[in-house]
């Protein structure tokens, strides 16, 4: 039976609570990932932040509405408002938008239990934690890869 330890990503990219949203966005894009754990100075799990947190309607942060047309960005709001939103966005810290109540797993949990947890809790990323520290992360992509490997 496969467990989280078998499929988790071991080299976890993380950020701190004081990481800027600008830096977070760059990390997510550069590494082609949808979210990262937030860890404090001692390496303990503080929270988790995802792309959804960046665009969530119920957060105080507002990303301007943009339409892409023929490779040009068209802002659906005034340019002055856009500039204000960008300034506010770059000044915002991860601690202001991250989820503090994080659903975590241990490395010995089965894939079936991981899938159930993801579905029930409606989460896409599960930090694998040992003694309060993140030792890995399991995302939906890891689950799909595991299923594909078993099918071969």
Per-region residue spans from a language model:
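N-terminal short leaders/motifs
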Residues: 47-57, 61, 81-83
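Bateman/CBS regulatory modules and CBS-like beta-alpha motifs in cytosolic regions of diverse proteins
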Residues: 1-27, 33, 38-41, 45-46, ...
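Short hydrophobic beta-strand motif reused across regulatory alpha/beta modules
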Residues: 47-50, 137-143
């Amino acid at each position: 039976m496969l467990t989280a330890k078998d499929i988790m990503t071991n080299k976890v990219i993380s950020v701190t609570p004081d990481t800027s949203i600008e830096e977070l966005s760059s990390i997510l894009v550069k590494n082609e990932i949808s979210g990262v754990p937030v860890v404090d100075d001692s390496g303990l799990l503080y929270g988790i932040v995802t792309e959804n947190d960046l665009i969530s309607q119920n957060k105080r942060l507002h990303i301007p509405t943009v339409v892409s047309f023929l490779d040009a960005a068209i802002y659906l709001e005034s340019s002055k408002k856009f500039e204000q939103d960008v300034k506010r966005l770059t000044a915002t810290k991860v601690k202001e938008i991250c989820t503090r109540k994080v659903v975590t797993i241990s490395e010995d949990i089965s894939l079936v239990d991981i899938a159930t947890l993801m579905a029930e809790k409606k989460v896409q990323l599960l930090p694998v934690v040992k003694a309060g520290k993140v030792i890995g992360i399991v995302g939906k992509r890891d689950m799909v890869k595991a299923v594909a490997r078993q099918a071969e």
